[in-house]
């Protein structure tokens, strides 16, 4: 199991959304805007059939939502925040990698979104990928957490636009597949 830019301890932006949007007078407008953003990003990524439910996503991505998920599925959880967890539990290997950086490519329209979410979120000064704090991205054995990519770059979304001066996201996935092959998995 590999967590890539995972919200393993929640997202500071989601926490901000829970505190300032959900249940408030802007909930409907915010939900419509976030659903539209999700629909556009899905379409640009070639997945227009995916449905968006922004409010449920915000709740799930919040610290409280992530904690509930982690309590149900704790294998690989780091022993300390920003630490490593077990990389083998019950025959399952646990790894993670993550990134930092909000502005990564001048042609990437998601950069503006991540500058905003980074500014609004509760991150306590921690570096982020625009949506998730660096240490929240760790799970199991952390391979790397300092790639200069935003949250979408890490999964090579939006036409594969990512930082031209950084490791290509596809290279990270290939290297990880090679790691598994070399382990006989």
Question: Residue ranges of each PLM-predicted region?
Answer:
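Helical cap/lid subdomain of alpha/beta-hydrolase-fold lipid enzymes
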Residues: 2-185
